[in-house]
UniProtKB/Swiss-Prot annotation:
Protein name: Movement and silencing protein TGBp1
Superkingdom of source: Viruses
Alphabetical UniProt keywords: Host cytoplasm, Host-virus interaction, Inhibition of host innate immune response by virus, RNA-binding, Suppressor of RNA silencing, Transport, Viral immunoevasion, Viral movement protein
PROSITE patterns (alphabetical): PSRV_HELICASE (PS51657)
GO BP of this protein: symbiont-mediated suppression of host innate immune response; transport of virus in host, cell to cell
Alphabetized InterPro entries for the sequence: (+)RNA_virus_helicase_core_dom
Record's keyword annotation contains Transport: yes
């Protein structure tokens, strides 16, 4: 356990509980470094193995990677699971990781460790997210713009979560992604197109608002995007 606790401290996770029980529950905002922490853990200590209910890692030259979770994972003492909210985690798991703000079908467990700081996007996005009642921090620089649906050109990767928006974009032959198609992916610049002026579905809206690194453009009916 000491090696995991040491890495959690190194990566800036805040401990919430003085008493720990298995599985150790770790929550992070997007870009908080949880996947990087898991990779460092399994490369540093060969006792550990890692599986994810999200996108698995590509094969590596070391042969060590985060693999896709499946029903027949052999029971072992030091197995960790990423994106645990997305699947059925075995009760013998050593530690489980997730970003609960992105939602998922499974229950959210009480966290032993959390990290609110993102190393993906910047202060402008963090401020917008806090205005929308999500707890996120960042020290980086980025740009956020909010415009009307037809007031400016699209930029970067276009994302949406509402079916009516998808139909509109297809009608105009705009290449775009429903948010579940790109879960776990990051892009330099993103345009989020929505038919509403507030996050109707908070989990899906949060995903759309956190796929970028340097630039986010929100297109909404009245050129506003607020908590309600």
């Amino acid at each position: 356990m000491d090696v995991l606790l040491s890495l959690l401290s190194e990566f800036g996770f805040e401990r919430l509980s003085s008493e720990l029980s298995l599985p150790i529950v770790v929550h992070s905002v997007p870009g908080g470094g949880k996947s990087s922490l898991i990779r460092k853990l399994i490369n540093k200590d060969r006792r550990f193995s890692a599986y994810t209910f999200g996108l698995e890692d590509c094969e590596s030259i070391t042969g060590v990677r985060i693999k896709k979770a499946h029903a027949s994972i052999p029971r072992s003492e030091f197995v960790v699971f990423d994106e645990y909210i997305e699947g059925d985690t075995p009760p013998w798991a050593f530690a489980v990781f997730a970003d609960p703000l992105q939602g998922g079908p499974g229950p959210v467990l009480r966290a032993h460790f959390i990290k609110r700081r993102s190393h993906r996007f910047g202060k402008c996005t963090a401020q917008l997210l806090n205005d929308l009642s999500y707890e996120v921090e960042s020290d980086l620089a980025d740009v956020v713009q909010i415009q009307g649906l037809y007031e400016t050109d699209l930029q970067g990767t276009v994302v949406y979560y509402e079916a009516c928006v998808g139909n509109l974009l297809r009608a105009h032959s705009v290449p775009a992604y429903y948010i579940s198609e790109i879960r776990g992916q990051t892009f330099e610049s993103v345009t989020f197109v929505t038919s509403e002026n507030y996050p109707v579905d908070r989990a899906l809206a949060f995903q759309c608002l956190t796929r970028h690194r340097s630039s986010l453009l929100i297109l909404s009916p009245n050129a506003t995007y607020t908590a309600s």
